[in-house]
Each structure stands twice: as C-alpha cells, then as structure tokens.
C-alpha cells in the first residue's frame, strides 16, 4: 500500500501531531491502546497507510517524534493517545534549542539528527511502498524550524524520489510568540523552498479568527486550533485511506498544484465549519461546501486570496455525492470568479471524491490552493527580518553557534526572490507570455538591491 511516515518536531509540531493521531485513530476506529474496535471493514482496509500492525493485532502509528527537550514529549506520552506510539520512536535531547534556529540546525540538533534518522529509516523500511513523509513543525521556534529543516534536507538526500509534505506554522502578523521569529522563519523558508515538495502554510492568527468568528468559540485554546489543522491533514490524505470514486494522493496533488518548482506553498481550507449551536439549521450541499471552501475567511493562513490570483487549487470532497455535481461546481467557481484565477492555466482546479465522510458529518470538503497571495506571508516576515538584520539585532546568538552573516543575506534574498516570482506570475497574462522567455533568469537580479 502507499504508506506515509509522519514526523513531528518541536513543541508546536508535537502538539499538532498528537492531535492528528487522535483524529486519525478515531476515523479508523483504533482506541488509545492500539486495538481496533470500529464498526466497518472500510476502516481497516487501508489502515496501513498510517499504521503498522504489530503482534496481537495492535496498530502502531508510523510516527517519529523528536524534540530537543523532553517536556512536550512527556505531555504527549501522558496524553489520551500517548500509549499508542512506539516508545523507541520518541527521540529527544535534554538541552532545548531556546528558540534559536542555529542551535536546532547546526549544534544541538545536528548531534541528535542521526538517532532521528535511524528511527525514520526503520519506519521507512517497514513500508511496502513508501509514498512520502509528512512533517508537522513551526517556523518560528528553534527545534521545529532549525532541526525540522535539517531533518527534511537529510531525508531528501536519502529518499530523493519520495514526496516531502510539510505542515508549517508560520509566524502570525499581529501575535508574536518570539522576538526572533522573523530570523527563524526566513532561514526555514530558505530551506523549504529547496527541499520540500509541498508546504501547507498555517498560522495561528488565521486559526484563531476561524475559531472565534466562524466556530463562535469565546476562548479558543491551542487544542482547538490544532484540531482545525488536523481535520485538514486528515482530509488531504483521506482518499489514500478510504475508497473513493476519484482518488488523489500526495504525488497527484503535487503534480496538479505546482506549476513551477519553487512555488509550492499552499493555503488550506475546510468546510463545513459551523458553530456548535447552528449546525442543525443548515443542510450540507455540494454548492454550499464549495462556496465555504473558497471563502477567504476560511483560509488557515493570514493571506487573503482576494489580493492575489490562484495558480491552481484542489478540492477533496468526502461523503456520498455525485461526481457530476462536484465537476459542475468546480467549473462554476472558475467561471464566476475568473479574475481570481490565472487565465494561462485553463482548468486549474483538481477535484477528488472520497466516499467515507469524517466522523459525525454527512459530507465535507478540504481545500488546498496555490495562490500568489501567499507572498503576503513572506513579505511580512521579510520586512520584519530586514528591520532587525539591518541593525544586526540578536545576531550574536546565531553567529555564536557558528553561523555566518552571509547565510542570513542569502536567506533574505531567496525569500525576496520567491515574493517577486509570485508577483511575476500574478501579473502575467496569457498574451504576453513570450516576453518572459527571453529574460527568464533575469527577474531574480533586481531584488538583490533590497539589502
């Protein structure tokens, strides 16, 4: 079968990951001890995408948990599904990265990375036909960003032909957890551009807004935010795990969503999101799911798709519905909002339908979009980066771990290049395509003046 190895790193990644296994285990009818007590054969048919079957019919997640301090791991282990994981797959150091990307990437993380790779290798060897890796981490801290990107580049070397998908929590515009977030995030994006295949961009502020405005939660906790992320993660892989009329997998997703290799940063959305009180007042229909999916308020990262254009998008529906209706709706969206889609990619929405809906819903939809508006995220982080870097603020923490200022400069210009690439394709029209071909290598050059 097409297995996925799940890797979670750092506090944020571990907390999202722990929640993810609760959601997935619930879908497959696996209880916290790893025993199956579901009610349908379909739950078991492809359970081995995410689980290994151990002796005595126990199901063990294909998960690798890593952190540079034991704290979060202990709380995962003490959590509701803590006994599910294989004890050897917890890999942790004792020192912590202290929100320092250099510690995660070069010093502390580099010492621990080999033991993490051993565990990853073991998990990969137990797969029949490994499809790829999914990583949950944040870009603002030290471990998830520094060590996470180190691990991604190492896995890239060892498994160059496997899909590398990351769920990356980016720094929010208004809420900042760490002062040095812009540094850590920029250095991470620099790595993700080169080494990841698909990056799902999330950020806490957008998730808060969804919890607050749409779900009407007065005091959203991180648990609520993580639950939103996990529903999306589960939706993206649903057609691998359950039978469907129109299947999608990680590779198909990549092929349909990435027109140019560097532009692989996606937005996520999910429908139906309704507050607990008003659920029973609305009937779920394919048109309603579609319109909520494409709603800007529904995006799980702080970039407004109305400020850019979609290069490509993908909608994964779950539940009993006619594929004809899905296709009509997709066409409908493109025709009504044609100005928000680039015209030089004619059919830019991919859809897939999986027959089994998530627990407690009749039907649902997961949205993954490749929009040029995502540059807002990078622009914002880039501006904060430049402001601090110009004064060399906090730089001694990084150079003290053996980093060079040159690396910061490179990361900065790589991110600026990324922004201008998105901008270039946002402005491109079908007619003037010929103009780009001659000077295709040229558009990176004028950015280097931004230092």
UniProtKB/Swiss-Prot annotation:
Start-end of Acidic residues biased regions = 429-451
Q: Where is GTP bound in this sequence? A: 11, 69, 138, 142-144, 204, 226
Q: Which GO terms describe its molecular function?
A: GTP binding; GTPase activity; metal ion binding; structural constituent of cytoskeleton
Q: Which GO terms describe its biological process?
A: microtubule-based process
State the name under which the record lists this protein.
Tubulin beta-4 chain
Chain intervals for the UniProt region annotation (Disordered): 417-451
The protein's job, in short, is:
Tubulin is the major constituent of microtubules, a cylinder consisting of laterally associated linear protofilaments composed of alpha- and beta-tubulin heterodimers. Microtubules grow by the addition of GTP-tubulin dimers to the microtubule end, where a stabilizing cap forms. Below the cap, tubulin dimers are in GDP-bound state, owing to GTPase activity of alpha-tubulin.
State where composition is biased (Polar residues): 417-427
Report the sequence similarity comment from the record: Belongs to the tubulin family.
| Compartments, record wording | Cytoplasm, Cytoskeleton
| Positions that bind Mg(2+) | 69
Its cofactor is:
Mg(2+)
């Amino acid at each position: 079968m097409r297995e996925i190895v799940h890797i979670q790193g750092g506090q944020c990644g571990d907390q999202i990951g722990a929640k993810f296994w609760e959601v997935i285990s619930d879908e497959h009818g696996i209880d916290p001890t790893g025993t199956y007590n579901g009610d349908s054969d379909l739950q078991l048919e492809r359970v081995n995408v995410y689980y290994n079957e151990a002796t005595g019919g126990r199901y063990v997640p294909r998960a690798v948990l890593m952190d540079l301090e034991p704290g979060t791991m202990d709380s995962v282990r003490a959590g509701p599904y803590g006994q599910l994981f294989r004890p050897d797959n917890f890999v942790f150091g004792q020192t912590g990265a202290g929100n320092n990307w250099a510690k995660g990437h070069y010093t502390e993380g580099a010492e621990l990375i080999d033991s993490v790779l051993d565990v990853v290798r073991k998990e990969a060897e137990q797969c029949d036909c490994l499809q790829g890796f999914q990583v949950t981490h944040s870009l603002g801290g030290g471990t998830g960003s520094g060590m996470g990107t180190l691990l991604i580049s190492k896995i890239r070397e060892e498994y160059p032909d496997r899909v590398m998908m990351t769920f990356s929590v980016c720094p929010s515009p208004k809420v900042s957890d760490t002062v040095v977030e812009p540094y850590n995030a920029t250095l991470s994006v620099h790595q993700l551009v080169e080494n990841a295949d698909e990056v799902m961009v999330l950020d806490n502020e957008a998730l808060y807004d969804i919890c607050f405005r749409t779900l009407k939660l007065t005091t959203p906790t991180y648990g609520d935010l993580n639950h939103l992320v996990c529903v999306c993660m589960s939706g993206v892989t649903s057609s691998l795990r359950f039978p469907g009329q129109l299947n999608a997998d990680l590779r198909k997703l990549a092929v349909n969503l990435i027109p140019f290799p560097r532009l692989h940063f996606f937005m996520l959305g999910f429908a139906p999101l309704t507050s607990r009180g008003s659920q029973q007042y609305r009937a779920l229909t394919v048109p309603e799911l579609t319109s909520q999916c494409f709603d800007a308020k529904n995006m799980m990262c702080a970039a407004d798709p109305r400020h850019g254009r979609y290069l490509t998008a993908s909608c994964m529906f779950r539940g009993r519905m006619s594929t004809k209706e899905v296709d009509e709706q997709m066409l409908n969206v493109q025709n009504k909002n044609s100005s928000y889609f680039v015209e030089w990619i004619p059919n830019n929405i991919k859809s897939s339908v999986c027959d089994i809906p998530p627990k407690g819903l009749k039907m649902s939809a997961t949205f993954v979009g490749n929009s040029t508006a995502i540059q807002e995220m990078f622009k914002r982080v880039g501006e904060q980066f430049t402001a601090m870097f110009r004064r060399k603020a906090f730089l001694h923490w990084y150079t003290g771990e053996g980093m060079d200022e040159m690396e910061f400069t490179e990361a900065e210009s790589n991110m600026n290049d990324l922004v201008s690439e998105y901008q270039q394709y946002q402005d491109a029209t079908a007619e003037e395509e010929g103009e780009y071909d001659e000077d295709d290598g040229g558009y990176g050059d004028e950015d280097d003046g931004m230092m």
